[in-house]
Structures are given as structure tokens and as C-alpha cells.
């Protein structure tokens, strides 16, 4: 089944899970699309089975809190950042609920975490104005970059380069093998005082970069030239909430939630809004991602919703 405007318009909430007492701050699908794992401000980690459509188990990180949870490539392991007492990144085995390794180094809250799509490398960005490069096999930081402001960062789909959004006005592209030489490309954007950048993602085809903000718009830029292709708005975000924006796996559509529980979808090529879907969420949709392998997506406030199409084109 191919994603089209009509298929997207047909998506409806198939299941809602109320496992959390506070907002879900992040979730991540496993690369095979079979499970999704969430982190929440209530200090819990919930693992869901996407095929059976049910929660499988819940773990807790009471002492440190849990945010920015990401699957690694090894089965049943995740990395996540703390949102409480320290800024160490933790590598957890879900299998026996034991920490495999800690990654200390950041001195302020970690605000970005991206796992390499191809190996055990990952990068983190922090309010201490640094981006750190790590390898899951070693607790020691493999590389460090000092920046002029708050960074957001992400790997490209090949795992060869990463992009850093700095100070909500610049995108810098780095070659992973020689990032200490500085960026090989820098794209300066029009600075907007009204909001901050909250995230950065590559499309699966590597041609586009999506910049999320805590304002009322998101930007789509050309990953090679840095030109702004589209600015998408018209959704509610009056309280400067961090709303996650995502590509569909075919790189054709862009989705974002809003503070009123609706999901807005645009065609990345034409820039036209193709759908507004009502998730009936009780709070702002802070997390939204399409499943990498199956025709389903998930959205979250303090509840988790799984969506399915109601037509089969």
C-alpha cells in the first residue's frame, strides 16, 4: 500500500493507551517497526507491541528521570538522557532492566540525541552549548564541539554526516570522519525572535531537512543547498510547546501535532496541506512519528495513540 493524500486523510485512531500520569516526552520505533518505546515525565519507560497493539511492559527511572529515549541497534537496548539530577546519558538493557554503560560529560541538560542509523555511534546536544560524539562501547566521549548556542542535531540516513542546528539560526553539516575540521557546509536562516528550534530531522532519502520550532511553524529545507523550500504553519501552538514534527518513511509528507490534539499533514513537494486529523488528545501532541515499516503512526500527549488507515488504495 502506497501513501497518498487520500490514504493519509483516512487515518483514524485505532487504539489509545493511558499508561502514563504525565506527558510522554519522547518515543522511538524499533528499526523493524514491531515495537515502540516511550519515555515520560512520570519517570517511566513503556514498551508497546505495534503488531498486537498493546503495552508489553513498564520500567522506571525514578532517580534520574527519562527523556529522549532512542533504540540502539542491539535488540532490547536503549539510550536516554536524564531530566532530573544529572546530565549523564544512560545505556539500558530492557531485557533485565540493567544499565550497560553511562556516558558522563555534559554539564547541562541534554536536548538532542541521535543514534547513527548504521553503527554504534551516537551524538548528543546540550544546553552547555556542546555536541558530543559517542560510541556505545566506550564511556568516553569520542569527540566534542563547542558551539555559539543551544544545539539540535541529527544523523543523515547514511550515517556519514550529521547536521547541527545552532542558536535557532544556522544549520551546519559535518562529515563524521573529519568533524574536528569544522562544518563542510553552513546554511544561515532568517532568525526569528518569536521561537526556538527544537529539533532537526533528515528525510529517509537524505534530500530534505525538517526544522521543528516551539512556535507556530516548521521549516523544510534542501539538505544540499540549504534553501528554504516550505514553511508550514496554521496549527495551534500558543504556549511555545515542543511539538515533534516528522517525515513519512517515503519522504513525501510532513506531519506535526498541535496543542489542540489535531495532526496537520503537508505534501513536501507542493507544500499544500493535505489533511488535518483529530486525535482527540487531552493535551498538546508532543510526540508524533510514522512507523518505519508498517502503515501506521503513533501520536502522544500523556496518552499514546496508534493510528491506522481506513481505506486501502
UniProtKB/Swiss-Prot annotation:
- Transmembrane helix as a keyword of this entry, yes or no, is no
Q: Which CDD domains match?
A: WD40
What Pfam families has UniProt attached to this entry?
WD40
Q: Which domain of life is it from?
A: Eukaryota
What keywords is this UniProt entry annotated with?
A: Chromosome, Cytoplasm, Nucleus, Repeat, Transcription, Transcription regulation, Transcription termination, WD repeat
Biological processes, Gene Ontology terms: DNA-templated transcription termination; lncRNA catabolic process; negative regulation of DNA-templated transcription, elongation; negative regulation of lncRNA transcription; nuclear RNA surveillance; positive regulation of transcription elongation by RNA polymerase II; RNA polymerase II promoter clearance
Key word Transcription regulation present = yes
Q: Which GO terms describe its molecular function?
A: chromatin binding
Which Gene Ontology terms of cellular component type are present?
chromosome; PTW/PP1 phosphatase complex; Set1C/COMPASS complex
Localization, UniProt: Nucleus; Chromosome; Cytoplasm
WD repeat ranges?
19-58, 105-144, 146-184, 192-231, 236-276, 280-313
Family membership noted in the UniProt record:
Belongs to the WD repeat SWD2 family.
User: Tell me, what does this protein do in biology?
Assistant: Regulatory component of the SET1/COMPASS complex implicated in the tethering of this complex to transcriptional start sites of active genes. Facilitates histone H3 'Lys-4' methylation (H3K4me) via recruitment of the SETD1A or SETD1B to the 'Ser-5' phosphorylated C-terminal domain (CTD) of RNA polymerase II large subunit (POLR2A). Component of the PNUTS-PP1 protein phosphatase complex, a protein phosphatase 1 (PP1) complex that promotes RNA polymerase II transcription pause-release, allowing transcription elongation.
Q: What is this protein called?
A: WD repeat-containing protein 82
Question: Which species expresses this protein natively?
Answer: Gallus gallus
